[in-house]
Amino acid sequence: AHYIEETGVPVNVLRNDKTSIKEIKNIIKPSKIIISPGPCTPNEAGICIDVIKEFHNKLPILGVCLGHQSIGQAFGGIIVQAKKIMHGKISSMTNENNSEIFRGLPKKFDATRYHSLVIDPKSLPSCFKIISNTKDNDKDVIMGIEHNDYPVFGVQFHPESIGTSKVHGQKIISNFVSL
């Protein structure tokens, strides 16, 4: 939320188990939605999947960590246990396929990961392109996705983490806010 506030955009933080689609639509009336990290699976993340299904064709959406997984699952992807659990670990991310949220970032950058779940790459719906990967045990792990038709993005890593370069994390958030 702090990186968003730094762009001058007002922020409303809502708990996924203490709000409703109706409240979001009729009272909050957001111009964009960020679905943030959390300690559970998309199935346990309150209304996150419902929010994605309701707003994906109406508003830009960015999912971070659990939000990224929720986006994948909302469109039919399968969330699986990661081969390597990453909590507070810095990894090298790729910047692929000219995503708007990675505009101005180098082709490789370091970011912090806190997760034990990932989107199974074999299940990634065809309506998404991969915009970032990392390697775990010489295998690609999806670190970023972008919908082919709507401004819906997910990043498995944490742009807001102290272990992610502040310049890169802020750039991702400001790129999203400027959509």
Regions found by a protein language model. Name each.
Residues 135-179:
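A glycine-centered loop/beta-turn motif at secondary-structure junctions
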Residues 10-18, 42, 94-95, 111-114, ...:
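Short gly/ser/thr-rich secondary-structure transition/capping motifs
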Residues 99-150:
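Catalytic beta-strand/loop cores that center a nucleophilic Ser/Cys/Thr
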Residues 1-60, 66, 165-179:
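N-terminal beta1-alpha1 cap of cysteine-dependent amidohydrolase-like domains
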